[in-house]
Amino acid sequence: MTDVEQPVSVEDQQAQAQSYYDQVLGNAYVQTAINAYTKTKEFHPLLNSTLNSAEEKVSTVGNYAAQKAYDGYNSYYVKPKNTAYEAVSYGTERAKTAVESGKQAAIVGGTFGIGAAVVLTQFSLALSAGGAALVLEQVDSAKKLGSSAISTIKEAELAVEHRIFSALHQAQRIAMVPVEKITENTNSLLDILDGAVQKGLNIEVPPSVNLTIGQRVKNLASLIVQGVSNKLFKAHDHVIDPINERARNYLEQLSQSFVLLDIVREKKTWVIEKSNELSTSVFDFKKTLEEEAQKYKVAPEEMLMKHIQSTSEQLSTQLQSLREKGQNVFGDGTKIDSTIDYLENLKKNFTDAEDVYKVRDEVLNEGRQRIAELSTWTTSLLIISAEWQFEPEDLLIEELYFDAPPPVRTRNLYRNRA
């Protein structure tokens, strides 16, 4: 039976965190990131309020960078490693055997644990937003091209196969698996993935007896596409689509507000008659504002300001709901958090400005850019969410999250596909 790691105390966790902070802050890659972060603030003063509010939670830029890195450490190393142990203890004998044979096959100093953590980290794309995006992207392309469902599924399965082989290769490179143990180690890691898929997607993964590595990966990819498709479309129908629709309505109102705001500021007065500069939808929106202004006995310019503040707050609420209810599909919510921070600052900027003519130009310029980005994002939310996910080359995982030794001579993992 494999020994399972015991939970560590709070004090030990804090000591581990501090040690990791120190390691991260001394890393050249992180120093480069901190420098870029600081320069971004210097050259884009408008971003200061958003970034400063995030920094206040951890007091300094350095600690902020370290906190983000440590969050990554937990997300991309600790959690996947724990998932590996969960998969092992899930009740499948093949997974138990996998770790035992892995220890014999691989490995000295716990590098099988690292390999299992890395493969689950990279592979988690196939179980969360990235996998959903892969499937959805193929389905969406098929609709546009009129392709058959069979060819669409096949393309999605091939994409997931590529992810699996990439994850295996990354794990074995970092764990420095000896060449003569590649096949045995690959099968062990695939056993771990079988357990993770079975638990994560709640589907039965049949035993892989006397199958080649290529056959195992192909079968696993097929099961993943089926499982992710079911998960994805259920989430879409019952959670994501309704919230996303409300968010897009608020976004459209915000967009109309900015169009009207630009014209009012340019003319230095409220636009009374219909203008060629106003689309029908914006003109109708203007009439609604005028009716509300008359009802509450305020100037239409003031009503426009209040509407922008209110819409920003409502859009922020919808995005927060999307983040909470859609987290099992999207995974990391960094992009949503950043947008929510921006909307809160937008509301504050308009409150501080007092009237439409005192709003700073840079606030409006960034607002127009953000609205365009949000419109694109909410139009194809799940496909765009693939950009939030991590790739080995994006994370520089061996440089940032692991104190990995230099790579050994090149190994040909793919020769075992046949």
Curated annotation (Swiss-Prot):
GO cellular component, one term: lipid droplet
Region (Required for lipid droplet localization): 211-275
Protein keywords: Lipid droplet
One GO BP: embryo development ending in birth or egg hatching
Tissue-by-tissue expression: Expressed in intestinal and epidermal cells. Expressed in the muscle and hypodermis.
UniProt-listed InterPro entries: Perilipin
Protein localization: Lipid droplet
Disulfide bonds: none
Domain of life: Eukaryota
Knockout consequences: Viable, and able to reproduce normally, but embryos contain large lipid droplets. Reduced body fat accumulation. Lipid droplets cluster in intestinal cells and contain a reduced amount of triglycerides. RNAi-mediated knockdown results in a reduced brood size.
Protein family membership: Belongs to the perilipin family.
Function comment: Lipid droplet-associated protein which plays a role in lipid droplet clustering.
Record-given protein name: Perilipin-1 homolog
